[in-house]
Structure formats: C-alpha cells, structure tokens
Amino acid sequence: MREIPQPAPHRIEPAANRPLVVGVVPGQSSLVALTAATWAQATGGSLYFGYADPTRIVDQEFADGTVRHSPLEPDREDDDWRQRFDDLRKQLTESLAGRPVTWELRYLAGRADRALTHLARAVGASAIVVGARQARGERVHDFFAESVGLHLARHQHRPVLVVPLSV
C-alpha cells in the first residue's frame, strides 16, 4: 500500500512571489477572483485559475499543469467546452479589469479537487483558493460530502482559502 505524504513543516510552500491556484466555475461570483487577486497582490504572486469540467476526462497530464481531455461519453462529440472556456476567460477578464495581477486560465477535467491539486503541484502554488459551496437546502452530510474546499483540505498539503459567497 502506497503511503501518502502528510502535511509537515518541511512541506510548507513559501508564499512570497509564488502563484495561487484558484478554482472557478461558470457564472461564479466575482468575489472569488477578486479575493484571489487581493492575496496575489499582497504576496507578489500570480494566479492560475482552473475549471475542472466534470463532463470530461483526463487523457494526459502535462508538467505545466495543463491536461489533454476528452468527453466522458466517447461516442458523443462535445465541442461545448471551447465555449465554456471562452466564457470563463471573458468572466475573469471583466472581474479582474484594472487589477495589477498576472493570471492564466487552465481548462481541466474530472474531479475539481484532483484537478486543482495537480495544477497546484505543477505550478508550485503556495495555496489554493475556492468559493464556498452554497447550501441550497441540502442535508449537512451532502453539503460536506461535496465540498471541494473540504476535499482539498483533507487530501493535499497546501493551505486552502475558502471565500464565502453568502452568509
């Protein structure tokens, strides 16, 4: 059985001048991008936004954090992802207008926690920023079972900043 590396003092990533990975979804509040930009400005780092498309699977992961992906259903051609990518880029460009921060958008695939972890490892991110999942009447168990922030905090060593989207 493979032993999973645990959080430890020697694994703390320096924050100064290091990138942040930011999980985004289409139509998400600009609070997530703006909060990440504020932290990036404070630390002198850049931002790598990542959207993990759950309708696609990873074919190959590359050292720079990008992935080659394909539709979950191989018999169905899906070029809608290109439009989602363009929409996300536009959403982020509008949200970050006038902010002096360098950023890139990566279109990922599969489970968000795994995709963001791969991206963070690849770019040497100091932390991962995600928006809080909004509870819409679900049971507490369901809320925590699906929380990307919680999965990230439990399955990788970087700090996770969860941005509240409503209170």
Model-predicted regions and their roles:
Residues 1-16, 94-128, 167:
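Structural beta-alpha unit
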Residues 11-73, 155:
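Small/aliphatic-rich secondary-structure junction motif
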Residues 48-50, 104-108, 161-163:
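General small-molecule cofactor/ligand-binding pocket signal
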Residues 64-68, 122-124, 147:
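Short, hinge-like loop/turn segments at secondary-structure boundaries
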Residues 127-154:
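Glycine-rich, Arg-bearing micro-motifs that act as flexible, cationic patches
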Residues 153-167:
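Short, flexible loop segments at boundaries between secondary-structure elements
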